[in-house]
Amino acid sequence: MSVMPDHWIKERALKDGMISPFVDHKEGTGVLSYGLSSYGYDARLDNKFKIFANTHSVVVDPKNFSQDSFVDREGDFCIIPPNSFMLAKTVEYFNIPRDVMVVCVGKSTYARCGIVVNVTPLEPGWSGYVTLEFSNTSPLPVKVYAFEGACQFLFFSGKERCSKSYDEAGGKYMGQSDVTLPIIS
């Protein structure tokens, strides 16, 4: 399994609808860069945010998750409080082919401000808008920007197709259209 180059990503994005909308170049003048890079794709952050807030003194329980754990915000940016957490989604819709596995990494600009981006792998056969998890590890508030680069996706092509894809397995996060909270099925 190898990380795939720009021309391969572009071909699969256009031919298979792997990324939509697809920006076939790196856009970075005056913004956090996004679009196609040499061995990845920098996705953009949408403008709807869910910020962890302890307004109701709830315990975060992944088996019994409460919407009360979050405050919803919408706008051109979001300020993540110190040592806090925020959920958002990508502008781009991903449709992962059956022979591809995708891993997400953070952007160095945000990392240097104390932001860690975490996304579990996009499995073969998965499709939807990606829910992004941002942790502010700094002791200061950090601003993140909507419609600008938020993370980079790396694409790995398997030597052969998997026996059972995410969609065939009935994956619980299949077809996400908005920020999706934890689901226990």
Swiss-Prot record:
Class of this enzyme: hydrolase
Record bears the keyword Transmembrane helix: no
InterPro entries on file: dCTP_deaminase, dUTPase-like_sf, dUTPase_trimeric
Reactions catalysed, as given in the entry: dCTP + H2O + H(+) = dUTP + NH4(+)
Keyword GTP-binding: no
Catalytic residue positions: 133 (proton donor/acceptor)
CDD domains assigned: trimeric_dUTPase
Pathway assigned to this chain's UniProt record: Pyrimidine metabolism; dUMP biosynthesis; dUMP from dCTP (dUTP route): step 1/2
An annotated Gene Ontology molecular function: nucleotide binding
Gene3D superfamilies assigned to the protein according to its UniProt record, in alphabetical order: 2.70.40.10
Swiss-Prot/TrEMBL keywords: Hydrolase, Nucleotide metabolism, Nucleotide-binding
Record-listed dCTP binding positions: 107-112, 131-133, 152, 166, 176
Gene Ontology biological process terms, A to Z: dUMP biosynthetic process; dUTP biosynthetic process
Subunit-level organization: Homotrimer.
Role this protein plays: Catalyzes the deamination of dCTP to dUTP.
Family classification: Belongs to the dCTP deaminase family.
Protein name according to UniProt: dCTP deaminase
Lineage of the species this protein comes from: Bacteria, Pseudomonadati, Pseudomonadota, Alphaproteobacteria, Rickettsiales
